[in-house]
Amino acid sequence: CARTIIRIYEPSQGKIIFNGQDIAHLKPRQMQPVRRNMQMIFQDPYASLNARMTVRDIIAEPLKAHHVCKSKQEVDEKVFAMLNRVGLTAEHAGRYAHEFSGGQRQRVGIARALVLNPALVICDEPISALDVSIQAQVVNLLRDYQQAEGTSYLFIAHDLSMVRYVSDDIGVMYLGQLVESSDSEEIYKNPLHPYTKGLL
């Protein structure tokens, strides 16, 4: 679902409406400006980071791809500022992914997704691979950023307590179909679909 929305996978049918535009069948060049405003945090912090790139280069990659900065100095300033926002430091910039814990790697992935200040971030099970002790830290980091910048999240998860904590609105999917959607409180107070009732 997440990879189809962001067009890593091609949709077989239907529409993907983003900012009033159907992006489901845009060509790669047409997707470029869309991608600047739509980023993704992947489920697996181990597989989603390039092992041959430093943390600095991983976070700088979107800035370079979208020609955001005019100089290497500006790139570094944005990278270091984002590292600080996700709870890391400039000293981490020269290291490689294998030198970090799972929670730190996911922070690097989050920094990469947020460095462009996108309108929408797709969070594909972003905490499921992390220790329980780290999960709340990562979720709070995302919430703090959202409150400061107004970013929207599409948070895909199976942990219903976490879903309730992070969501204003909830959609329930069953066998690839959206079977119910409502605001968070209504879903929990008055679930309508049998699958939703079973989850709760």
Provide a role label for each language-model segment.
Residues 115-119:
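A short, proline-enriched helix->beta-strand linker immediately N-terminal to the Walker B motif
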Residues 14-22, 34:
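Conserved ABC transporter NBD signature motif
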Residues 96-100, 104:
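Conserved ABC ATPase signature
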Residues 6:
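Helix-to-loop junction immediately C-terminal to a conserved catalytic motif
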Residues 53-64:
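Q-loop/switch helix immediately C-terminal to the Walker
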Residues 126, 130, 134-200:
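P-loop NTP-binding/switch modules centered on Walker-like glycine-rich loops
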Residues 22, 73-91, 200:
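Conserved ABC ATPase "signature" region
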